[in-house]
Amino acid sequence: MNQSGTNQSSLSDSNQAGINQPSTNSLGMNQMDMNQGSASLYEMNQVDMKQPSMSQAGMRQSGTNLPDINQPDMKQPDTWQLGRSQPGMLQQELSQLVLSKAGISQPDPSQPGPSQSGPSQSRMRQIGTNQSGMSQPVMQQLDSQSGGSQPSMRQVGTSQLGTSQIGMSQPGTWQTGLSQPVLRQPNMSPPGMWQPGVQQPGISQQVPSHPDMSQPGMSQQVPSQPGIRQPDTSQSCKNQTDMSQPDANQSSLSDSNQTGIIQPSPSLLGMNQMDMNQWSASLYEMNQVDMKQPSMSQAGMRQSGTNLPDINQPGMKQPGTWQLGRSQPGMWPQSLSELVLSEASISQPGPPQRAPSQSGPRQSSTSQAGTNQSGISQPVMWQLDMRQSGGSQPSMRQVGTSQSGTSQIGMSQPGTWQTGLSQPVPRQPNKSPPGMWQRGMWQPGMSQQVPSQLGMRQPGTSQSSKNQTGMSHPGRGQPGIWEPGPSQPGLSQQDLNQLVLSQPGLSQPGRSQPSVSQMGMRQTSMDYFQIRHAEAGDCPEILRLIKELAACENMLDAMELTAADLLRDGFGDNPLFYCLIAEVNDQQKPSGKLTVGFAMYYFTYDSWTGKVLYLEDFYVTQAYQGLGIGAEMLKRLSQIAITTQCNCMHFLVVIWNQASINYYTSRGALDLSSEEGWHLFRFNREELLDMAWEE
């Protein structure tokens, strides 16, 4: 283990106050067999949080009891404890979760979890990787040089299975184990990058770590990000013996240590937040006041520009939730195809253990390891722009994987992939950055939805995920997710029903969050206007509206009716007509109401069809037209006609009122004048008198 120039003080020196990592090897610890049985994170987790048997992430510890892994009192037998997971510890067939946080590229799962890509990771070039033109800020050591990893450690012969750094084309590498069904993301890579062979069906990547384990022929094709050629992909991180990394001062956790950061579980840290000061990345300080996020605060949730701390709204308990973020990379079930955490812009091709790794307190613009592409992320699978922090890549459905339950952080249920959570509309075709088309990325079968947190803004929606300031409902315990209020207008997720993980009573899956009143949308229901049957006292108002209508039809001179006539004929023992009245609230009126419309009707008879409802007048004051009042009145009239056994409704429209003609026609009314050739005639009183008295 020749680590020239690299300071690797053990974890004990890592300034993480309060973090006692009894059994954990120094970051750089080259774990030959990766057999880190009980390298428990013991107290590595949040202060007071004991994770006794916490197996290195990625390391499938069947039978290990991860009692307090991230969730106090939570037993997670048999779980893939992602947490603190040591990327390199992936089990056989565990698809290469690859890529961890920016700067912390943990391609080869080799880097034991704690590895914190120290602030000085920048400019670390991976020897052997031809990064033509690929400037990887904080260039993750392709070899999984995540932070504390042993810069000089070189794993001879180990072909770097899981590095997948954007732009790194690893031709010929066929990552066994990735088994990425249907992963096929033709144009997934950044614009111009073509990843033809990304398919990786049925491959089984055997413990990529094991130095010297060079798996001949095993080339990691998937992660291969076109652009960078890694001819031999030999670059296995773990043992980079000669890989001196100039300037990479990796004093294990100590240098990379962020003051005040308790890196209890891999979570939190994993949250690569561009421009985000991850000062208190640890769950502890990370939690807002009163916020208990035992399981890992929304790690993985990319919150550009937001402080992790605010991620959790004060008082909000998020116990045991897959806080999308940081979806325990290591937690992926065996055979789970490379989900790619992909945190917006944080291309995380593989579930790389980004957790512990925090590249410097400030991870500004550190795009995920390997993802040096500013803005582009995760060629391979990652839903560009999807910001689907956490493994949940809507479009990425992994075939057959099921992840039942919400799986609390760290509690990855091996083999299960959150079935119930299936993210509706996973298919988000145009989510990726312009030009990047993720066709085929669908990965049928896997309904990986978990990560989807309501509050989590999907494609294009910034929604600093869980932090919507002001959006938080303090004290609202949403185990699992922050659903930005039911009516978060800006949050509306196009087509994405943003299913909520387990928001009891909080948000209904599939429910779009605009409020019922759609903010700004005119209320056209009864809370704005009321429609009722007219009473005797309404006669003056009815007369006023009749005159307005007559004036509109240029027939005001023909108006002879009085309020007394209306009272006598419409409100006696045998009414000759009936009226519906439309009112709106008006505080200036003594009654508090203003009559803005009416409909006068009566019943007649047709010798061919029977009873008919005849609509004599139908009018809404012009200032209140267009609010749905007329449509509601027409609906009421139709209901009356049906309940009174009428077979049709007749009415007249003046010939020059084309707007009304068009409206009624669009609703299905027939113009009998043209359809059947009828003419409406009328005898006035004089003619009636003449006829009545003629001899």
From Swiss-Prot:
Location of region: Disordered? 1-274, 290-332, 344-375, 387-493
Q: Which residues bind acetyl-CoA?
A: F618, Y619, V620, G626, L627, G628, I629, G630, A631
List the biased-composition ranges (Low complexity): 105-122
* Ranges of residues in domain N-acetyltransferase: 529-695
Q: Which residues bind substrate?
A: C552, E553, H650, F651, L652, E676
Which stretches are tagged as biased composition: Polar residues? 1-39, 52-68, 78-98, 123-179, 197-208, 231-266, 294-310, 355-375, 389-422, 459-471
Keyword flag Metal-binding: no
Q: What is this protein called?
A: Spermidine/spermine N(1)-acetyltransferase-like protein 1
Which species? Homo sapiens
